[in-house]
A protein has these predicted regions:
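Hydrophobic targeting segments
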Residues: 14-18, 41, 56
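Conserved core of the sugar-phosphate nucleotidyltransferase
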Residues: 112-205
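Short acidic/polar active-site loop segments enriched in Thr and Asp
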Residues: 54-55, 101
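Short, polar loop motifs at secondary-structure junctions
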Residues: 59-65
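N-terminal nucleotide-binding beta1-loop-alpha1 segment
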Residues: 2-28
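C-terminal catalytic/acceptor-binding lobe
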Residues: 199-228
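Short phosphate-binding loop-to-helix
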Residues: 68-104, 111-114
Length: 228
């Protein structure tokens, strides 16, 4: 569906860039890391605005660090912590700022291509849509596995009920790992929980990907110089 400015005004939706959590491999919030001289969150904001989006916010615990980007800052306690040399033991699903109105949650540590943001903005949903990469992955993609990028949510009641259900299923031991975006999407879809299901979502397959380590920045510096 081609989304016009009239559509954006009629079907109003807030876009929240999720920039919470603590990542001990990073000296500052990794969402503020610069790619080609531009902070990742600033790049995402710019690309959203280039696609007609005006209602943009950043959700974070570290409010002061994210001032100055010209968008609303939503204080949100996200206890998720990723240690330097261990897996996270705190819940990832607390990352979503509570909303009752339509919202698009954009993962704040993802370096998006212009086409990726355009796809997210122009994809309509009557309920909930999920955006991620998928195998077979393109050669320009920096990893060997798929990564999640965003949730677009019209039915917020259903979305937050799914989060509660996912946490409940986790306590019952129905997942093989701590639930993250993939497991949440399985609960939303109603598919079996004992195997991660990388299907039935809007696929974005280009260089769009999140950053895990400081060394990832150099890769995107090289890619963006020739791709954008």
């Amino acid at each position: 569906m081609l989304v016009t400015q009239e559509y954006l005004e009629r079907e109003h939706m807030k876009y929240i860039i999720m920039a919470g959590g603590t990542y001990e491999n990073w000296e500052k919030p990794k969402h503020l890391s610069e790619v080609c001289g531009e902070p990742i969150v600033a790049r995402t904001i710019r690309l959203l605005r280039e696609n007609g989006v005006t209602d943009i916010a950043i959700s974070t615990t570290n409010v002061r660090a994210f001032l100055g980007f010209g968008v609303t800052i939503l204080r949100h306690h996200n206890p998720y912590t990723l240690p330097k040399d261990a897996d996270a033991s705190t819940p990832w699903l607390d990352a979503f700022y509570p909303m009752t109105e339509p919202v698009c949650y954009i993962f704040g540590d993802v370096v998006f291509s212009p086409r990726a943001i355009k796809t997210i903005v122009e994809t309509d949903t009557g309920s909930i849509e999920f955006f991620a990469s998928a195998k077979p992955l393109p050669s320009i993609y920096p990893k060997h596995w798929a990564e999640p990028f965003a949730f677009k949510v019209k039915d917020t009641s259903r979305f937050f009920k799914a989060i509660k259900d996912t946490n409940k299923f986790d306590k019952q031991g129905l997942f093989k790992r701590q639930p993250i975006a993939w497991e949440l999407w399985q609960v939303i879809k109603g598919t079996p929980l004992n195997k991660v299901d990388y299907t039935n979502y809007t696929v974005i397959n280009d260089y769009t990907c999140d950053i895990d380590e400081p060394e990832d920045i150099a890769y995107f510096d090289r890619i963006l110089k020739t791709s954008d």
